C-alpha cells in the first residue's frame, strides 16, 4: 500500500460517519464530560470554502470531526505529524463552525466557538504539547483559545479499553512503525494485537459493541498494519490476528 498519511484521516472520518456513538467516550475523556453513552450525537457539516490569498483560488476546507452533543459543539482534529499549520487550521475550522451556527440579533452576531482538541497519531520530541491561538482586537483586548494536545503514544492499550476510546484503537499499532518497517522485533506488537482482539471480543459479548462495530474496528486495525508494513513479511502474520485481510468493512 502506498505510504499516504491520508489513510489515517480516511479511517478517522469513516469512523465518524459509520460509528459516531463511539466518539462519545472519547469526548467525555478529552473534555472532562459525562455524556450518557446511549445518546445519539449529531455530525455537523465540516466543509467550507476559503479564498487562498497566494493563488486567488477557492479552496475547500474540511475538518476531521465536528460533532454536537446535547447542544455542545466539539472539534477534533486527527494529525499524523506536526506540520506547523495546525493552529491556523483550527482557527479557520472553528470560525467557520461558529459562522455556520451564528446567532443573529438586530445588528449583533454571537459566534459560539467549539471546544477543540488535536490528536497526534504519531509524535516526537518536537510535537507541541499545546495548540495555542491568540485573538487580538484593536481595542487591546486579547483572548486565548488553547487546548492541550493528545499524544496517542501516551495512552496505554489498557486505558484505551477501560476508557472505551475506540476511535484511537486502530492507530495504536503506529507506535511500532519503526520495528515493522525495519523488520525488527515485533513480539510486543503481536502481543498487543492479541490483547485488543481478546478485549474487543469481550466487549462485544457484553453487548458494548455491535457486530459491525467490532468487525470494523478490527478491519481498521488491519488497514493501518497494511499501510505501515506495505506488503513486507510481517504483514500477513499481523493482520491474521484480527481475522485476515478485508478490503471492505461490514458497515460499508
Residue ranges: model-predicted function:
Residues 3, 7, 44, 88, ...:
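Alpha-helical structural elements
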Residues 34-37, 44-50, 98, 172, ...:
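Charge-rich, low-complexity amphipathic helices
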Residues 68-80, 103, 183-252:
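Short, charged alpha-helical interaction segments and adjacent helix-coil junctions
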Amino acid at each position: 500500500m502506498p505510504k499516504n498519511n491520508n489513510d489515517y484521516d480516511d479511517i478517522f472520518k469513516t469512523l465518524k460517519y459509520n460509528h459516531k456513538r463511539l466518539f462519545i467516550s472519547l469526548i467525555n475523556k478529552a473534555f472532562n464530560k459525562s455524556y450518557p453513552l446511549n445518546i445519539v450525537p449529531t455530525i455537523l457539516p465540516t466543509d467550507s470554502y476559503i479564498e487562498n490569498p497566494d493563488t486567488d483560488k477557492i479552496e475547500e476546507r474540511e475538518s476531521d470531526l465536528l460533532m454536537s452533543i446535547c447542544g455542545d459543539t466539539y472539534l477534533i482534529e486527527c494529525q499524523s505529524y506536526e506540520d506547523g499549520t495546525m493552529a491556523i487550521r483550527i482557527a479557520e475550522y472553528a470560525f467557520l463552525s461558529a459562522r455556520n451556527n451564528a446567532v443573529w440579533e438586530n445588528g449583533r452576531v454571537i459566534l459560539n466557538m467549539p471546544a477543540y482538541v488535536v490528536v497526534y497519531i504519531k509524535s516526537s520530541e518536537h510535537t507541541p504539547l499545546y495548540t495555542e491561538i491568540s485573538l487580538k482586537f484593536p481595542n487591546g483586548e486579547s483572548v486565548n483559545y488553547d487546548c492541550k494536545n493528545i499524544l496517542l503514544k501516551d495512552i496505554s492499550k489498557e486505558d484505551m479499553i477501560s476508557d472505551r476510546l475506540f476511535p484511537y484503537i486502530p492507530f495504536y499499532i503506529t507506535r511500532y512503525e519503526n520495528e515493522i518497517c525495519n523488520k525488527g522485533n515485533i513480539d510486543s506488537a503481536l502481543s498487543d494485537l492479541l490483547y485488543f482482539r481478546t478485549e474487543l471480543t469481550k466487549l462485544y459479548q457484553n453487548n458494548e459493541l455491535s457486530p459491525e462495530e467490532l468487525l470494523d474496528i478490527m478491519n481498521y486495525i488491519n488497514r493501518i498494519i497494511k499501510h505501515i508494513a506495505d506488503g513486507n513479511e510481517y504483514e500477513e502474520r499481523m493482520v491474521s490476528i484480527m481475522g485476515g485481510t478485508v478490503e471492505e468493512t461490514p458497515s460499508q
